[in-house]
C-alpha cells in the first residue's frame, strides 16, 4: 500500500494535467515555449507516473489492466478479471 500523501499527489497532478491540457496544446502548436514554461510544472503529462488503482503501488504497473502485477495475479487467480485465465502449453 502506497502512502496516502503520494496517492493524493498523483490525483492532484492528474487534475492539473486535465485542467491545462487545452492551453498546453495551444501553446505547443503556436511554438510559445516561454508561455509553456510559465505553466505549473505538474501540469505536464510527462511528470505523471502510473499507479495501481487498488492500492496506489507505483511499480510493476500493467497498463492494460490498470493495476500492479501483484493485484493482477491475485484477482486473476480468483477469476475476477474477465477474459484472463492461467496459461498452459
From Swiss-Prot:
Descriptive protein name: Small ribosomal subunit protein uS14
Top-level taxonomic group: Bacteria
Keyword Ribosomal protein: yes
GO CC, any one term: small ribosomal subunit
One GO process term, biological-process aspect: translation
InterPro entries per the UniProt record, alphabetical: Ribosomal_uS14, Ribosomal_uS14_bac/plastid, Ribosomal_uS14_sf
Subunit structure: Part of the 30S ribosomal subunit. Contacts proteins S3 and S10.
Function text: Binds 16S rRNA, required for the assembly of 30S particles and may also be responsible for determining the conformation of the 16S rRNA at the A site.
Keywords: Ribonucleoprotein, Ribosomal protein, RNA-binding, rRNA-binding
Gene Ontology MF terms: rRNA binding; structural constituent of ribosome
The keyword Cytoplasm appears for this protein: no
Similarity comment: family membership: Belongs to the universal ribosomal protein uS14 family.
Source organism of the structure: Lacticaseibacillus casei (strain BL23) (Lactobacillus casei)
Amino acid at each position: 500500500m502506497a502512502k496516502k500523501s503520494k496517492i493524493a499527489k498523483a490525483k492532484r497532478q492528474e487534475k492539473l494535467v486535465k485542467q491545462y491540457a487545452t492551453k498546453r496544446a495551444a501553446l505547443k502548436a503556436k511554438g510559445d515555449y516561454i508561455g509553456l514554461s510559465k505553466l505549473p510544472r505538474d501540469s505536464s503529462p510527462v511528470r505523471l507516473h502510473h499507479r495501481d488503482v487498488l492500492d496506489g503501488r507505483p511499480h510493476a504497473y500493467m497498463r492494460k489492466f490498470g493495476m500492479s502485477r501483484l493485484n493482477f495475479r491475485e484477482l486473476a487467480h480468483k477469476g475476477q478479471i474477465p477474459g484472463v485465465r492461467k496459461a498452459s502449453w
